[in-house]
């Protein structure tokens, strides 16, 4: 058993993101890994807007669930006459019905993600996360749509329940990823708040919305947009980052450049290192507290993480 688990783990690690650019073949191969992922757990339905998960309804459905005492309002066609005759008390059959829930996947491919100090760039990590979610949604029979956005353009993928929708998303991820060539954005680059505003137009009520980004420009205006989104959609934020953004440890000064100007940073100074670390923690703390206030899920993955293993820990299908 341990040998099998080790073999599976090694196979999954082979699918983890690597390098500065995403490879389409690797994104396609994630289909085999995503078969073990389940995005949604079964729960009782609250309204007709719920979908993409197994929900409980009175009356005829897909799968037989259980028999219980007849209640006022039950469909008489669902009465279990055998149990009723045996007990002399009316009983009703309950069924489970598969309710559709479109899944929208928004993936950030702006310049700020074109960075990585180990294993892979943030932009590559984001493409792998988005691809895993898309394949998992397809395996669950959901409609898949989304948006891939860069600094100056974006591509909307209309929701469809087919492999073609996933393939379109993967091709757009690959195309946008390979357009990146610098971590420095132009002054008129697309902002996250504008993308979230578009999300309110694109994502339909009752859908599940996954947003993959480094959220470097997340602010109170973004929170306002998310507040409106979260009223009608099930939002999950997926934050990607690199360890070098989290902490900067160096015994020597480092030089940075935007391609025109060059600046030397006192990275060997303890006060500078602490201020650098505090800036990252403060921003992530604001993002985390914002998600809590809105009642939405926030997940974080680093470029050095074993992504496939961590996705299974979060979205493991129940055997």
Positions of predicted regions on the chain:
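Exposed, interaction-prone extracellular/peripheral surfaces
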Residues: 2-56, 69-74, 83, 92-128, ...
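N-terminal low-complexity, intrinsically disordered segments
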Residues: 77-87
């Amino acid at each position: 058993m341990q040998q099998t688990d080790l073999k599976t783990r090694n196979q999954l690690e082979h699918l983890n993101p690597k390098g500065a650019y995403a490879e389409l073949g690797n994104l396609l191969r994630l289909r085999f890994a995503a078969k073990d992922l389940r995005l949604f757990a079964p729960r009782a339905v609250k309204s007709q807007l719920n979908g993409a998960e197994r929900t409980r309804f009175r009356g005829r459905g897909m799968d037989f669930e259980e028999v219980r005492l007849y209640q006022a309002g039950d469909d008489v066609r669902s009465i279990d006459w055998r149990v009723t005759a045996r007990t002399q008390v009316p009983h009703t059959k309950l069924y489970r019905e598969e309710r559709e829930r479109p899944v929208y996947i928004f993936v950030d491919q702006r310049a700020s993600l074109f960075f990585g100090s180990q294993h892979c760039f943030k932009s590559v990590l984001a493409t792998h996360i988005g691809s895993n979610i898309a394949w998992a949604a397809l395996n669950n029979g959901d409609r898949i749509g989304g948006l891939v956005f860069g600094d100056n353009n974006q591509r909307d993928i209309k929701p469809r329940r087919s492999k073609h929708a996933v393939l379109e998303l993967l091709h757009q991820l690959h195309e946008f990823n390979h357009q990146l060539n610098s971590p420095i954005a132009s002054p008129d680059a697309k902002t996250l708040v504008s993308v979230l505003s578009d999300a309110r137009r694109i994502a339909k009520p009752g859908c599940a919305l996954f947003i993959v980004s480094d959220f470097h420009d997340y602010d109170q205006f973004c929170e306002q947009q998310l507040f409106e989104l979260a009223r009608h959609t099930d939002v999950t934020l997926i934050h990607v980052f690199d360890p070098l953004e989290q902490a900067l440890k160096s015994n020597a000064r480092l030089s940075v450049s935007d391609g025109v100007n060059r600046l030397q940073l006192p990275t060997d100074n303890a006060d500078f290192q602490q201020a650098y670390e505090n800036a990252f923690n403060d921003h992530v703390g604001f993002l985390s507290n914002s998600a809590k206030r809105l009642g939405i899920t926030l997940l974080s993955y680093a470029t050095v993480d074993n992504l496939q293993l961590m996705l299974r820990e979060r979205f493991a299908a129940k055997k």
